[in-house]
């Protein structure tokens, strides 16, 4: 979200555009507070830029529900999800266990890495329409999606450059999209009945 309207891929720390939503502005402000507290008070802070986190126990309800649990819930009920836009927008979906690993690594990181922001993603890129049909296939469903207008404030594409987190936090995601999505699908099939 802090990358805003900057079109470049992959998204790299230090190359941000104008933010597109109040949420993105609060994320950017939080990172600035972290840098300031490191400079003024010596407090080690680490700005973690999570890219489209998904996994078990994610709430599929509500206005801000993530796309994967929302799609799974509807497909399991034999209902057609709405894809905002044309489905060709892409995201770097990051399995929750990668985020947990990154947070633990940040807790143990050297002070030299403090005050910095880090992309926490898988480093991959998945188109929403491909995600949708992969979920359909995994669930044995043949339901066509409904397409709606693109949401205001949404970016078109997202893909994390995780090289800084690899170097300074020793972050190495264990779960690529395929491995994570299989675990998530299994969990939702078992728990969303």
Question: Which residues does each PLM region occupy?
Answer:
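Short glycine-enriched loops at secondary-structure junctions
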Residues: 1-2, 151
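Catalytic helix-loop patch of NAD(P)-dependent Rossmann-fold dehydrogenases
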Residues: 2-47, 59-64
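Short beta-strand->alpha-helix junction loop in the catalytic core
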Residues: 55-57, 152
């Amino acid at each position: 979200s802090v990358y805003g309207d900057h079109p470049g891929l992959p998204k790299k720390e230090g190359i941000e555009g104008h933010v597109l939503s109040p949420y993105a502005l609060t994320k950017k402000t939080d990172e600035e507070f972290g840098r300031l507290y490191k400079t003024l008070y010596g407090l080690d802070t680490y700005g973690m830029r999570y890219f489209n986190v998904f996994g078990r126990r994610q709430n599929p309800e509500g206005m801000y529900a993530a796309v994967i649990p929302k799609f799974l819930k509807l497909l399991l009920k034999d209902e057609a999800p709405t894809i905002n836009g044309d489905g060709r927008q892409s995201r770097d979906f990051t399995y929750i266990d990668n985020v947990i690993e990154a947070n633990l690594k940040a807790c143990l990181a050297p002070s030299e890495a403090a005050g910095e922001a880090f992309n926490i993603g898988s480093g991959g890129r998945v188109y929403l329409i491909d995600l949708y049909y992969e979920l359909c296939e995994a669930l044995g469903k043949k339901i066509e999606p409904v397409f709606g207008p693109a949401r205001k404030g949404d970016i078109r594409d997202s893909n994390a450059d995780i090289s800084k987190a690899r170097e300074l936090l020793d972050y190495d995601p264990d779960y690529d999209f395929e491995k994570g999505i299989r675990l998530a699908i299994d969990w939702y099939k078992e728990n969303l009945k």
